[in-house]
Amino acid sequence: MLPTILLYIVIFLYGIVIGSFLNVLIYRIPNKENIVTTRSHCMNCGYQLRWYDLVPLFSYLALGGRCRKCKAHISVQYPVIEALNGVLYLLVFWKYGMSVDSLVYCLLFSTLLALSVIDFRTYEIPVGFNLFILALGLIHGAFHYTQSVSYTHLTLPTIR
């Protein structure tokens, strides 16, 4: 029982970490900002966030939803996306267990979550998200192709 609970805690933590990265994508992709090299910062004062300001969900709660430096409000989107992604990961792993399907569905749900928020805010869907979903689908389909192929429908009827 305890190892199962620990596994679900780890899965949730992994989900909120990915959710934190989704927030980076949600903000930076529509603004054409670099998602790799640009440091996270306060949108109000430009304060570069320290590692302890970036702990998903917990930093937001510890800071009361405000910037450490200027005390400006931080959008509630950040903890909501992180928590929602963590819960989605829990549900996927609860349904499919430790499998390739779980990994693929988690990546798919995370991508759709980020894509939905960007679309809601900008009325645009970045092409990169569609290409990622396409690649994910092709890889998943190729992985399961050998398990699901049935040639019985290709047999010719016999004449008697």
Model-derived regions: residue spans:
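Intramembrane alpha-helical segments
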Residues: 71-149
